[in-house]
Every structure is written in C-alpha cells, then in structure tokens.
Amino acid sequence: MHEQRAKPSAFQLTIRPDNIGVITIDVPGEKVNTLKAEFVEQVNDVLIRAQQHPALEGLVIVSGKPDSFIAGADITMIAACTTAKEAETLAKKGQSTLAQIAAFQVPVVAAIHGACLGGGLELALACHGRVCSLDDKTALGLPEVQLGLLPGSGGTQRLPRLIGASKALDMILTGKHIRARQALRLGLVDDAVPQSILLQTAIERVKQGWQSRRELPWQERLLNGPLGKSLLFSIVRKKTLAKTHGNYPAAERIIQVVRTGLDSGIASGYEAEARAFGELAMTPQSAALRSLFFASTALKKERGGNAQPHALHRIGILGGGLMGGGIACVTATRGGLPVRIKDVNETGINHALKYSWDVLSKRVRSKRMRPAERQKQMMLISGSTDYSGFDQVDVVIEAVFEDLSLKQQMVAEIEQHAAPHTIFASNTSSLPIGQIAAKAQRPEQVIGLHYFSPVDKMPLVEVIPHATTSEETIATTVALAHKQGKTAIVVADRAGFYVNRILAPYINEAARCLLEGEPIESLDKALVDFGFPVGPITLLDEVGIDVGTKISPVLVEQLGPRFAAPAAFDAVLKDGRKGRKNGRGFYLYPSEGQQRQRHKRADTSVYILLGITPKSHLQQAVIAQRCVMMMLNEAARCLDEGVIRSARDGDIGAVFGIGFPPFLGGPFRYMDQLGVEKVVKTLEYLQRQHGEYFAPCERLQRMAQQGERFYPQGS
C-alpha cells in the first residue's frame, strides 16, 4: 500500500532574519491564484505555524505568481452548492478564515502586484495594511456583482469602514477595477510604489508597528450620520434601479447588506452578507451570469482552428474611417502590435490617428495612463497613402466601403504588395467572404473579421472562414482578436453571419410595432426594461439606418422574404435620415453649439413622414415579447444550419455583440429557462396574431416534441 501524498500547500511561510514572516501564495499548477474551499485548512495551518515563532514581529502576504496577486475565488465552488444554505456556509467559512488574519496578534500587510480581485481584495482588506505596485497590471476590485453575487467574505463590511460608504457602494455595485494611484487616493491602499521596492515597502510598514486607522474624508463622515446615511442610500437605490430596471437582484441586496452593517453593527453585517450570498447563488440571474463567465473564459483559450497560429509581428489596416481607426487603436494599445494604415488620402490617416489619441487622452485625463505611455503607444501607429511597409505585415484588416468589387480589388493589391504569408481579413458586415475571395490567388488566406462599433468598447468579433480558408488562417485570426482584447466566435459564411442575422428580425419587428402607431420612446423603453442596454430604435440610429438597409437585401436574397424590412426604413432613408452620424434619425440630435438634452426626444416629424398617429396601445411586455421571440427563433435556426458552432457561441455572440440581457445568459440559456415548448407555443400564438414570419423553426418544434434543451440540465 502506498501512502497518499498530501497536496502541496498554496501558502508557504518563510521567516526572515529580522523576524518578519513572508507568506507566499502560489496555487500549484495554476497560472493565477484563485481561492478554493480547501485552502481554509491551509490558511489555518500557516497562521498557526507563524504564531509559534516566538519573536515574530509581523507578516507580509505576497503572491508567487508573476503578474497576479489573487484573481478572485474559484467560482466552480458555487456551482457545487445545491442549496442556499450550502452557499451561505461557503461564505461563512471564507469570513471566519479572513477573520483570523484580521485578528492576528502582529501586523499583517498585503503586498499587492497584479490582479487583486474579489476574494483576493477581501483577503487584502482583512490585513492591517496594504501596499501595491504602480504597475499597469495592478488592479483592485470586487467584481462579484457581475456574476449576480456580492462579496461573501467580509468585503461588504470592511470596505465601507475603510474608504467610506459612498465610495464602497460605487466599487461594489459597479464591480469596477481600481488602479494603483486611484486606490491610494481612495485610501484603499496605504502606499503605491514601483514593483522593485514593493516587498521592502511592505516590510518597512510592518516594522512601523500598528498604525492608527486613516480618518475618512469629511464628506464620508457626514454621510455616516443618520440624515446623511438615509440620503445616501436613497440616492444610491434610485440610481441603481434606473440602471438595472430591477433585473439584477444582487444590486439591491448589496445596498441592503451594506446598510445592515452600518446600522446594526459589523456582526449583523457579516450575517446578512453570508445569507444574501447564499440566496443570490441560487438565483437564475447568477446562474446565467456565471455561465457567461465560464463561456467567455473558455473561448479565450480556444484557437478556433485545428492548427497553430502564425506569429504576429505587424498588422496592416486598409481604411482610416471610424472602423479602421478603432481597429488600429485596439491593435496597438491592447495588442502592443505595430500598425500600418493605408488610406487614399492623408485625411483618413489623420482621422485614424486622432481616434487612438482621443481614446488614450481620455485615460490620461482620468489618471489611468501617463502622457509618456500615451506617446509610446501612439508611436506604434503609422500611415501612408501607398503600400510602403505592407511587405512586413502578417495580417491586413480591410475596413473600406461595403462594395464587393472594391474589396476584391483590395485582395488583389494586398497579394501584389504584401508578403506571401499575409492574411487578408475583411471587416465586412454583409458581403459573403467567399465572394470577396473569389478572384484571390491565395483564397486560403482570406477570411472575415467582423468588428462591432465602437471598436474600442464592443468586446466581440466574428471570425468568418469561407469554404477554402485554411485552419492556420483561422487560428492566426483568432489569436489576433485575442491580442486585441476581443472575444472571438467562429461563424459560417452565410448571409448576415450570426449577430446581424439575429438582429435584423428583432429590429424589423420593432419597426412593425412603430407602424402600428406605438411611440418611438415606448418601443425603446420596453426593450430597455426587458434588459437590453438600448432600445431597437436607438440602436438603429446609433448603427446607422443606411447600414441596416444595406444588410436587409442580402438577407432577403439568401434567406427569404421573412427578412424583408418594413417600408418605413426606405421612407426614412429617402428623407436623408441616417441616424446619429448625420444628426437626423428617429431621435432629435443637437446641432453643433446647441446644448445637449438630458433625455433624448423622438423626432415627431418621423410620424408625419410615416403617416402614423403615435399612441401607446401595446403593453411593454407584449412589445418585448414580439421583438425578442423573433431573435430567439432566428438564433435557433442559426444553430440548426451550423452558422454558429454551439449554443454557447450563440449566447456569447448575442450578449457581447448586441447586448442581449446578460442576466438571461443569452438566447439559448433563456430558451432553456423558459422551456423550449413554451417558446414554440408563444411563437405559434404570435404567428396566428401577426403572420407567418413568427412560425417556429423546425429545430424548436423538434426539440419541443422531444422535451430537449440546448444545455444539459444543471450545467
């Protein structure tokens, strides 16, 4: 019989000659540190061993990982919980473990470099002091709300007492990441220093002994009084509800739990925190948000093709417009890759350079970047009106007008001027990639790479191989997207690809509701209340009414009359309305020099143009149902036809590309939640009410008959 070897501990203690202990957190076999349930015993053990040292003066907690302190708790622990009580117990274990650090008899200081998030920041908050590195990789935050949860190991109680209730609520409710200098200003850390002296600074802080707690700013002290507290929580609750529309229960519970701790004491706060954590862990919203987290994490590790990607050294971009400028920006500033832009004139190149300058300047103004770093990143972007420098690029991303012959010409010119290995990636939103590659000498190196506007903010790209695109080209294009900070889904070369294909029927149904006399604001409000970030009419104005009408004929030609856009769009376009970009759309936009309106107002002349009298007659839930059911039906068709590789990819595409409500997990998770049989019955009812275009697709009918789901039960 062989004796089973104990797992190596993630917490290693070293006692220095000056009697200061250094606890190094290094989870074996993992790239980053995440906190796991089994670490409770390991933390207990390391603290007991430290206590046994008779002359111990203090402890410093550091990470053994190169650029990560603790990335958070391992959320697979939550999936293992089957009841709220089990999840509550998990939170209580975390609380009691960190309470041991907080109650330790000598000073404990956290030396933070890299990501310090979720349970990682809660651990740091339990320490008696915190210092962090000034490195760009250092970020502190409590992002649990983004998983439909709240910090469950004391974060809702310690943070308000450290930096004040208003700033703590802002951090916890948004899940935002705080950089080093901002953390210092907030009082979240006691010092921020270069990484090279981080450990020494933490040791010096321990040697200074117990420090008196930093006094909160007078504004925060004012808000601690009964009147200030009542006012603060009233304002926060109102603002939060305006953002969440009541769709995210975690936000309301965070406010309640923080208030409980401040009103009834920290012990009551911990009790409320653990109970709320347990209950939130069992909500469908948290399950959906966690599924998106796992899906996006998995996608970031996938290559997209059965081949190794080629090395990427330089990138070329054709076109310096809005899309070209945005692509250049993310390639240089996030990917760290030199970019060469070609445009027909200097104005286009300057436009692209200004795009990156404006994005980086915003970071400089908010003190998230130094001017020297902005200059360094701008140096990565250059431009030319000819193809000089293109013989060095590995991928060329084409972002010119939506014209097939022009794009084919671009392919020919790149094959002439670039290296034989250069990949041609087209940022088309509607043209078939196979047609763009039709005259190519190396069609296996032509692919679609569809970005969404604004490029620096939208996280999704669609990677679109055509019939003869090579696996190496797919893998290299996905690798480039990852470098740009994007989540990539590989979709088939079919009309509209995936995102635009499911978006078109959704927008068309909103237009039909408009033609029935439903006011513009009422339509948008219905879908925002449902959970979309903006309504369908606002979205059309933002994307461009002309862009929407260009995609529609392609969809009708290849997929049939159900994609025919209502005549309303043609009438609006003929009136010279393209949306926000030309200041004329479904909404009013202030002209230059005019003051911006606090709330957007619909342009009532649109009603005259369309010959309708606006009157709200449909219930908000009915409007949302009509629009969303069209999207769900089309998403199921896309899966059936192989446009997307999996329900997972379809959910990520809809949430990251359109803003499908994250708390529903995406179209496929939502259909599972409703039950496919109910989806089919709803579509059949709408079909009887409004027409054949609501007919449920074969995939949904088949699944309903057989009682099937898109995801396994409990996954």
From Swiss-Prot:
GO process terms (BP): fatty acid beta-oxidation
Keyword Lyase: yes
Protein's name according to its UniProt entry: Fatty acid oxidation complex subunit alpha
Documented EC number(s): 4.2.1.17, 5.1.2.3, 1.1.1.35
Any single Pfam family the record assigns to this protein: ECH_1
UniProt-annotated stretches for the region Enoyl-CoA hydratase: 1-194
Record SUPFAM superfamilies: 6-phosphogluconate dehydrogenase C-terminal domain-like, ClpP/crotonase, NAD(P)-binding Rossmann-fold domains
GO molecular function: 3-hydroxybutyryl-CoA epimerase activity; enoyl-CoA hydratase activity; long-chain-3-hydroxyacyl-CoA dehydrogenase activity; NAD+ binding
Organism ancestry: Bacteria, Pseudomonadati, Pseudomonadota, Gammaproteobacteria, Enterobacterales
